[in-house]
């Protein structure tokens, strides 16, 4: 079980995650092998001054193909390019589009396990309070805002 949490409070946003990744493999007709790693990076930060106000947490499916979400971040950052500071919603859409494309390229069409979930939190220019969005790849890629508004604070997991 993987854990990711986003808390939107009146004094800021908290993003947290565990660090365990569980991977399994099975040869046809053979036993299933399960391996645990306790050093995965599931709290994602992004380079560039325009992106330092946004972070993300991932949980659910540990990998897309053979790679963790964290291993894709350099490619995602290149796809962002340099420029103006994005809103949290726009950033969430771009993150979702990027990972949905990778999922469709790498994952088997008949995959029936859990998806990869992202909680994206950050601050828009001139807003007093942060925003949190949830994205589920591949099932629900459209970002959904959690605890919207200036008086709705709470936790998402």
Placement of each model-derived feature along the sequence:
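N-terminal nucleophile
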Residues: 1-157
